[in-house]
UniProtKB/Swiss-Prot annotation:
Protein name per UniProt: Cytochrome c oxidase subunit 2
Gene transcribed to yield this protein: COX2
Organism: Eeniella nana (Yeast)
GO molecular function: copper ion binding; cytochrome-c oxidase activity
Keywords tagged on the record: Copper, Electron transport, Magnesium, Membrane, Metal-binding, Mitochondrion, Mitochondrion inner membrane, Respiratory chain, Translocase, Transmembrane, Transmembrane helix, Transport
Family: Belongs to the cytochrome c oxidase subunit 2 family.
Cofactor field: Cu cation
GO terms under cellular component: mitochondrial inner membrane
CDD domains assigned to the protein according to its UniProt record, in alphabetical order: CcO_II_C
Topological domains, Mitochondrial intermembrane: 1-38, 104-247
Amino acid sequence: MREMMMNNMLNDVPTPWAMYFQDSATPNMEGMMELHNNVLFYLCVMLGFVTYMLYNVMTVYNKSAMAYKYMNHGQFMEMMWTTFPAMMLLMMAFPSFMLLYMCDEVMAPAMTIKAMGLQWYWKYEYSDFMVEKGETMEFESYMIPEDLLEDGQLRMLDVDASVVCPVDTHMRFMVTSADVIHDFCMPSLGIKIDAAPGRLNQTSALMQREGVYYGQCSELCGVMHSSMPIKIEAVPTVDFLAWIDEQ
């Protein structure tokens, strides 16, 4: 029982009636969650302040309609409702810009994975690894139909070939499309990047824990848009190299 309480229960998949983010697996996603919590706190403070002011105005005027008969202006209040929101916006803006530029930075990646969206599946290419034929390692990933799912597999999320990545390794994802606009979205990794035909977008990720992460195409791309799940497995480097040798 004590061991069960000591273990962390990680949420890396969408859950019914979920009200919060999936658990973070990268520094970028950790920063997004922290920024969200801070902004939500500021919004609650502002909501409480505005609610108090409205309540105060309604109760005072209800007691006496002549309460502010001789009040022409209030310099202190004018200064407060200008300075207070400005300071709050600055406290939200600075962390937001820092996180934005941090997420856009691609730091000397140890390996690159190219993801190409097609109607309606994903094609992946490991540009740093070669197969026996001398070509770069690549494979296609399709959603497993509901009637072929095995015990433990997730409906509309599991695929026949998942992406395997090593943990604690700087990864670069290069995303494009072969037909219409798609979107490569992995909530636990803090990744959401457009896959546009004729354009090669890039983003980075540093997975800090082992796990299986799920995502989906987040751009309406046709009748089978919901059939483009993404599955990434983060494994130790030794297991990753063994998986590469098997391909």
